Amino acid sequence: VTAEPAPIFGVFVPQGWKLEFAGVPDPREQWRLAVDVAVRAETLGFDSIWVYDHFHNVPKPSHESVFECWTTMAAISQRTTTIRLGQMVGCNLYRPPALLAKITSTLDVISGGRLDWGIGAGWYENECRGYGYPFPVPKERIAMLQEAVEIVLSMWSQPETT
């Protein structure tokens, strides 16, 4: 009889996307709260922490803080040692694939190999428009996602990518 795999538990780190910091006016205090959740999750034995790849709040933009996911994970990686780090889920429309390959590989190195990379085609049109990113039709976004995954995987594993 083989044992069932143990459940894996993760927790979201507050970063403002869902207005988790409403009522906390100081961004430095908001950051301390985010880091405290990550450190506490590791101390409690969670397997992973997760952040959203968004730039402003939902359901519509507000003036509340939202911490950018890659910067957030890089900083938290230096305050933790074992917990895995992931995005739920990275948006392909926000960063060119070659840059994304560099960001992800850098974070994986500085975190000691703890990155769990997730990427999607993008869905939040208001956010894309608000930051000046094109928002193609779904078929085109899916094709762009496929190409991006191929580029990132090649840049991670091949001596040269063309």
Model-assigned labels for residue ranges:
Residues 7-29, 92-162:
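Flexible, glycine-rich active-site loops centered on histidine and acidic residues
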Residues 43, 82, 109-112:
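Alpha-helix termination/capping residues and helix-transition junctions
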Residues 49, 85, 115-117:
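Hydrophobic residues within beta-strands of alpha/beta enzymes
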Residues 52, 88, 118-120:
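Structural motif
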Residues 62-87, 144-155:
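Alpha-helix-loop-beta-strand connector modules within alpha/beta enzyme cores
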